[in-house]
Amino acid sequence: MGRKVHPIGFRLGIIKDWSAKWHASDKGFAECLTEDLKLRKAIAKKYVDAAISQVDIERQSNKVTVSVRTARPGIVIGRGGQRVDEMRHFLEELIGKKVQLNIVEISQAELDAFLVARSVAEQIERRVAYRRAMKQAIFRSMQAGAKGIKVCASGRLGGVEIARREVMHEGRVPLHTLRADIDYGCTRAHTALGDIGIKVWVYRGDILPEAKEQSEPEVTEMAAVMADAPAAAVAEAKVADTVAKPKRVTKKAEAEASAEEKPKRAAKKAENITKEEE
C-alpha cells in the first residue's frame, strides 16, 4: 500500500525552509529538541485564539530567537507590547536561556493551510455541518487567490458509528511538482463523539528559480577596432592582410606551370637555331 509523502518535508532545501535552525552535538541534541517542544507547546497553549500558524526557532550560542507567525498580531503583542514582554520572560524562565521574540504577521490567513484547517475544526466543534464548513473554507481560499485546495476530514462524521473519510477539492494540487508552492496543515476537532482529523493542502502557485544574468561575450581588441573602423579602412585592412600572407604554391600547381613552359622553351630553341643557320 502506498504512503503519502509530507508535502513540506518533500520540498525542504528546494523551495521550503526548516522551522528549526540550529546544530548540536550528539549529547546536546536531545536537550535542544526538548526545549523546542516546550517552547512550541507553551506558545500554543498561551495564545489559543491568536491564530498562530508556525513557530520558527533559531539558536546562536546562548541566545534563542523565536519567530511566531500569526494572523492576529494584536492579540500576541498586546497593548504597548506588554504581552510580548510577559511572554519573553515566561519563555526565558522555561528554558533558562535568553530569548528574543519576533512577531510575524500573516497577511492572508485563507492561504495558510494550518489556519484553514483550524477554522474548519472550530466550526465542527460548534456543531456546524462538516460539509458546509469544508465548502466555505474552499470558497474563501479560492477567492483569496489560491490555485487549488484539498480538504480531508476523517472520523465519526455526522455522529455515525462507523468512522469514514471525506475529501473535497477544487483546482489543481500537484503534489509531485517540486517547484509547486504547496502548504500543508493538519489539526483535530474535539467533539463529544470523538476527535475528527482535518487535513488541508493549499496550492499557491509555482516558485521559479531566479534567472541567471547572462555575461556579455568578451570583445577582443581586433574586433573592437573592426567595429569602430569605417568600411574603407576595413577593406584596406583585408587587402593588407592578403598581401602580408603570400599564397602557398602546391606541387600540383608547379607541375602544371612547368608543363605550360615546355612548348615555349622548344619554340624559342628552334628560333635560335634558324637564326644561327642564316
UniProtKB/Swiss-Prot annotation:
Entry-linked Pfam families? KH_2, Ribosomal_S3_C
The UniProt GO MF terms for this protein read:
mRNA binding; rRNA binding; structural constituent of ribosome
Q: Where is the composition biased (Basic and acidic residues)?
A: 251-278
- Region annotated Disordered sits at 244-278
All copies of domain KH type-2, residue ranges: 39-107
User: Record's PROSITE patterns?
Assistant: KH_TYPE_2, RIBOSOMAL_S3
Q: Does the keyword Repeat apply?
A: no
Q: Which GO terms describe its cellular component?
A: cytosolic small ribosomal subunit
Family in the record: Belongs to the universal ribosomal protein uS3 family.
The subunit structure is:
Part of the 30S ribosomal subunit. Forms a tight complex with proteins S10 and S14.
**Protein name per the record:** Small ribosomal subunit protein uS3
Query: From which source organism is this entry?
Result: Dehalococcoides mccartyi (strain ATCC BAA-2266 / KCTC 15142 / 195) (Dehalococcoides ethenogenes (strain 195))
